[in-house]
């Protein structure tokens, strides 16, 4: 995974709602490690699936972003969650 690319993809596409690992729309659904674990969103596959398909207020990015960029962003999110954002 390319974490530098993941950070760029995240900044351009995700940070509007998820800056600093937070969630501007649904404040309890953050990208913090404990919340990701509690919602079974602490794997690359889980994050990639949700980014591609969307859920509730989150739009689908499949078709807007290539799979490699989504995977890099997912790796970046997990990396940042391990560091506590």
From Swiss-Prot:
Matches recorded under Pfam families: Cytochrome_CBB3
One GO molecular-function entry: iron ion binding
Subcellular location: Plastid, Chloroplast thylakoid lumen
Binding site for heme c: 14, 17-18, 58
Post-translational modification: Binds 1 heme c group covalently per subunit.
GO CC terms of this entry: chloroplast thylakoid lumen
InterPro entries assigned to the protein according to its UniProt record, in alphabetical order: Cyt_c-like_dom (IPR009056), Cyt_c-like_dom_sf (IPR036909), Cyt_C6 (IPR023655), Cyt_C_IC (IPR008168)
Domain of life assignment: Eukaryota
Predominant localisation class: plastid
Keyword hit for Cytoplasm: no
Gene3D superfamilies noted in UniProt: Cytochrome c-like domain
Keywords: Chloroplast, Electron transport, Heme, Iron, Metal-binding, Photosynthesis, Plastid, Thylakoid, Transport
Coiled-coil region list: none
Transmembrane segment boundaries: none
GO BP field: photosynthesis
Function: Functions as an electron carrier between membrane-bound cytochrome b6-f and photosystem I in oxygenic photosynthesis.
Subunit structure and binding partners: Monomer.
UniProt similarity note: Belongs to the cytochrome c family. PetJ subfamily.
HAMAP family for this protein: Cytc_PetJ
Database matches in PANTHER family: CYTOCHROME C6, CHLOROPLASTIC
Official protein name in the record: Cytochrome c6
Organism expressing this protein natively: Pyropia tenera (Nori)
Gene: petJ
């Amino acid at each position: 995974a390319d974490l530098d690319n993941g950070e760029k993809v995240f900044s351009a596409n995700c940070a509007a709602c998820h800056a600093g690992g937070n969630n501007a729309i649904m404040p309890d659904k953050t990208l913090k490690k404990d919340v990701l674990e509690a919602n079974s969103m602490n794997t690359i596959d889980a994050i990639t699936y949700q980014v591609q398909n969307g859920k509730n207020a989150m739009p689908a990015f499949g078709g807007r972003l290539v799979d490699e960029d989504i995977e890099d962003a997912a790796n970046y999110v997990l990396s940042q969650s391990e560091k506590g954002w």
